[in-house]
């Protein structure tokens, strides 16, 4: 059985890990980094860049450099959070035909799973380069508070990237696995506070050890899938823009290039203020007006940053209270607090968490790598490499159906351990009703319309009967990935209808297959592009070396040969500007044939140089020998 890799598909950064024996290993990417920016860029010449190369060119290509795509995955365009992002993102968020949030890249509509697949492909390639073999299976992490549509969209991204997603695992649970697996922790209850680039989760997890087997049981989870480091960056960006406007009277929001530079500077300043009390945001030539170029130089203190984001940090505290309440625990029952996600490096976040739990968070868990390590451990559990580990996760939100009067009736309550199955019998609302619509919902509100619509389906062929008489059994079945399967059965006629919940949004099978084919075609075109570049480099080298040899040959090269070589050189030079690999190879071959006489001359010159060098060495050695005097010696016997 091949390796199942663990991938933390993050909003800001992603990370990949594998099991190496009984320990998890985080893998370095092609740039030598252990984490990869979740940034994808589509360049003018049709190339797709992922990670650091994409980040480096963002300033010159802001509209086609996509970041924080995870905030859009599985979401509707009309969602309030999407509308907020649409107003501030340099790239164009649009509504797809099915109502989902998609992105317009150079006039082409692209789905978030399709874009996220590019990051997953890089993670896959990183693992393949390390292992030296193809990788086809993965465990991918998602925020614990992701709903069904977001989980399904993440699985779709994996498929488009050529990965069979063996399991979707919640990020805080993965971090708990990373923390608890290699430590003799005994029985403990821990809180995992996960504040990443775009999402926030809190999970209360119980670790039990019985006869060498460790059980990780999630007692409760809560969160906010639109709260993270990107929001902290936005506050800093808005502050800098407002300060610059006050000072210079120019609003930088209308300048995508300036805003991209500002985004990078704001993120850098935020990070610096985790270790320093103040920093300078210094951006020369940020813009210009009739009076000339304008420079930005603004001093930002840690206190200022904290005042800008205090409400964001406070927003993370309410879910902590709810999670503890749902778990039936108090703060004193928590033995360890683990911080996950880059934004938890901010001293203010650490202080607030310590104040809430009444204890300092642990510092021995790497906030950037713990989640990928946990995903790799789960992969090891699935392959049998990791034994004696049992993971019991929960569904983050209640699941139910709409019943008479527009009410949501829950069949599975939030924080129920998964996988799970639950059935309930419902009836008709009208006399002789022959069909019912099963409207599936996810959320905690009583009014059906206030919850997340996961989709609907019809059960037809119900036997005519007075209202309230037919018995329709609705069964909800949640798998280990937290994805819902629903069936409805008329107990009288035996008619049954089943669906795996694919939200009314989401990608259909045909769209996924199309994107898989496109991804495979891209892989082929990437390979061809790489081969073309290699051939071009060989051609360039041949041009340079041939010209040098013509120069060195001088008058020894007959005029006819020289003319033929010049013609072949010119033809190769023209061919190198094109995209035809076969033509470049043909022109290189023609140049090689035209240069046969030149090669002979070059070889003769080389042989003469060698002979000359050897002669010089010999005469030098002879001269040295003339200076040598044979020593006369006689044996001196020791006197005894």
UniProtKB/Swiss-Prot annotation:
CDD domains: ASKHA_NBD_HSP70_DnaK-like (cd10234). SUPFAM superfamilies: Actin-like ATPase domain, Heat shock protein 70kD (HSP70), C-terminal subdomain, Heat shock protein 70kD (HSP70), peptide-binding domain. Gene3D superfamilies: 1.20.1270.10, 3.30.420.40, Actin, Chain A, domain 4, Substrate Binding Domain Of DNAk, Chain A, domain 1. The modification Phosphothreonine is found at residue 199. InterPro entries: ATPase_NBD (IPR043129), Chaperone_DnaK (IPR012725), Heat_shock_70_CS (IPR018181), HSP70_C_sf (IPR029048), HSP70_peptide-bd_sf (IPR029047), Hsp_70_fam (IPR013126). Acts as a chaperone. PANTHER family: HEAT SHOCK PROTEIN 70KDA (PTHR19375). Belongs to the heat shock protein 70 family. This is Chaperone protein DnaK. It comes from Enterobacter sp. (strain 638). The gene is dnaK.
